């Protein structure tokens, strides 16, 4: 049985989020949540909430044992980039890029 969850338009850089996601790919759910709990990156908190949502989805689908779940697939796609401008000297402006990410996770039984 598989359960999935998706986080869309998260205000996180896809490149930095992939570093966090790579730490939990293929691990058991309890192990993955422990790793994320002690990770200093800001994206770890959102990925942890996403994993908990996927576990809740698995329970709703009738998973017999939640402790047997593991992270089968997890990946980060780049979302749209919000472009802003900040004023600079002599009437110029500089771009500020605010990237977004889409994170998808699939849990499966061992």
Curated annotation (Swiss-Prot):
A GO term, aspect molecular function: rRNA binding
Family matches, as Pfam families: Ribosomal_L22
InterPro entries to which the protein is assigned, alphabetical: Ribosomal_uL22, Ribosomal_uL22_bac/chlpt-type, Ribosomal_uL22_bac/org-type, Ribosomal_uL22_CS, Ribosomal_uL22_sf
Keywords: Ribonucleoprotein, Ribosomal protein, RNA-binding, rRNA-binding
One of the GO BP terms on file: translation
GO CC annotation: cytosolic large ribosomal subunit
Family according to the record: Belongs to the universal ribosomal protein uL22 family.
Subunit structure: Part of the 50S ribosomal subunit.
General function of this protein: This protein binds specifically to 23S rRNA; its binding is stimulated by other ribosomal proteins, e.g. L4, L17, and L20. It is important during the early stages of 50S assembly. It makes multiple contacts with different domains of the 23S rRNA in the assembled 50S subunit and ribosome.
Descriptive protein name: Large ribosomal subunit protein uL22
Species of provenance: Geobacter metallireducens (strain ATCC 53774 / DSM 7210 / GS-15)
Taxonomic lineage: Bacteria, Pseudomonadati, Thermodesulfobacteriota, Desulfuromonadia, Geobacterales
């Amino acid at each position: 049985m598989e359960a999935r969850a998706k986080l869309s338009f998260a205000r996180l850089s896809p490149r930095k989020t992939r570093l966090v996601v790579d730490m939990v790919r293929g691990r058991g759910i309890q192990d993955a949540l422990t790793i994320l709990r002690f990770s200093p990156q800001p994206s770890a908190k959102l990925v942890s909430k996403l994993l908990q949502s996927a576990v809740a989805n698995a329970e709703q689908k009738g998973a017999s044992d939640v402790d047997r779940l593991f992270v089968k697939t997890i990946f980060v796609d780049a979302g749209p980039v919000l472009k802003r401008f900040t004023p600079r000297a002599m009437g110029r402006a500089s771009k500020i890029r605010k990237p977004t990410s889409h994170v998808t996770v699939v849990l499966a039984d061992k």
